[in-house]
């Protein structure tokens, strides 16, 4: 388990490129036949990926020991979105088939967590966010058909994008975790611009659907102290509540956002005008 500490905004603005990347960037999300796990002190979120190829992958009691409990979900909830080939997640003996861009919410108290791919040649890529939870909500699958997409932005400002809200109160109940998937229209490059912060929630982005020769310049920092991190395909970045989180790519891309914090009100944002950025 890779542990990342919280960083004060005054400290963050003094960091050089390599230190910014070390503190906020998660480079290796998917590793064949393993799970990856990054534990952030910011709202205690855990972020990672699971890619079964030649055999199934189980998250067992070894993780619980690192959290001071018996199992990962003794006091946590888990949200998973599959960005790879078809697979399945077995939760306490019950199999849930999870296709490309299907998602599964797993509530507090689940014990057995086994992840499998249907085909080794096209393995599932289960990206997950895991947050502290104090109530057990039912495990539930969410498919793209269950989500009402919202299209925002404009081609003229290069930010036309479709937002798919998977884990939000209108779709299912969670303790605090919210997750969704935003896809930029072809030829569009910007996400979340004009940008915002939200003092009451932190956020994690996973960028994917990127070609090998492309990148995203992820903008972070306080609005008057902006910095950037260069992101490649299937990399994630941690965004503290004091930081903007926006990006511009060399080509169109897709990203998964996950939030935890005080509330689940999607529009609870502190907007920042473009002319106020520095």
Curated annotation (Swiss-Prot):
Gene that encodes it: kduI
Cofactor dependence: Zn(2+)
Alphabetical keyword list: Isomerase, Metal-binding, Zinc
Family: Belongs to the KduI family.
Top EC class, one word: isomerase
SUPFAM superfamilies documented for this protein: RmlC-like cupins (SSF51182)
Pfam family, one: KduI
Catalytic activities: 5-dehydro-4-deoxy-D-glucuronate = 3-deoxy-D-glycero-2,5-hexodiulosonate
Cofactor comment: Binds 1 zinc ion per subunit.
Residues that, per the record, bind Zn(2+): 196, 198, 203, 245
Pathway assigned in UniProt: Glycan metabolism; pectin degradation; 2-dehydro-3-deoxy-D-gluconate from pectin: step 4/5
Gene Ontology terms, MF aspect: 4-deoxy-L-threo-5-hexosulose-uronate ketol-isomerase activity; zinc ion binding
Species whose genome carries this gene: Salmonella heidelberg (strain SL476)
EC number: 5.3.1.17
Entry annotated with the keyword Isomerase: yes
Phylogenetic placement of the source organism: Bacteria, Pseudomonadati, Pseudomonadota, Gammaproteobacteria, Enterobacterales
This protein's name: 4-deoxy-L-threo-5-hexosulose-uronate ketol-isomerase
Record has Zinc as a keyword: yes
């Amino acid at each position: 388990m890779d542990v990342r500490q919280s960083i004060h905004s005054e400290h963050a603005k003094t960091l050089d490129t390599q230190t910014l990347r070390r503190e906020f960037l998660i480079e290796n999300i998917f590793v064949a036949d393993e799970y990856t796990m990054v534990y952030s002190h910011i709202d205690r979120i855990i972020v990672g990926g699971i890619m079964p190829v030649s055999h199934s992958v189980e998250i067992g009691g070894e993780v619980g020991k690192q959290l001071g409990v018996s199992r990962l979900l003794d006091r946590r909830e888990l949200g998973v979105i599959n960005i790879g080939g078809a697979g399945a997640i077995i939760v306490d003996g019950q199999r849930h088939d999870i296709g490309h861009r299907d998602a599964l919410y797993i509530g507090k108290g689940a014990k057995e967590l086994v992840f499998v791919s249907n085909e080794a040649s096209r393995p599932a890529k289960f990206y997950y966010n895991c947050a502290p939870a104090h109530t057990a909500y039912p495990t539930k699958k969410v498919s793209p058909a269950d989500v009402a997409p919202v299209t925002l932005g404009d081609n003229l400002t290069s930010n036309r994008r479709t937002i798919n809200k998977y884990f939000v109160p209108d779709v299912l109940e969670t303790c605090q975790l919210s997750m969704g998937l935003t896809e930029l229209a072809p030829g569009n490059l910007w996400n979340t611009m004009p940008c915002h912060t939200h003092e009451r929630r932190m956020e994690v982005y996973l960028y994917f659907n990127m070609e090998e020769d492309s990148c995203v310049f992820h903008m972070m920092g306080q609005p008057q102290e902006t910095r950037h991190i260069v992101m490649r395909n299937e990399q994630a970045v941690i965004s503290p509540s004091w930081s903007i989180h926006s990006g511009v790519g060399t080509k169109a891309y897709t990203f998964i956002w996950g939030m935890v914090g005080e509330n689940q009100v999607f529009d609870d944002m502190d907007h920042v005008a473009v002319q106020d950025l520095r």
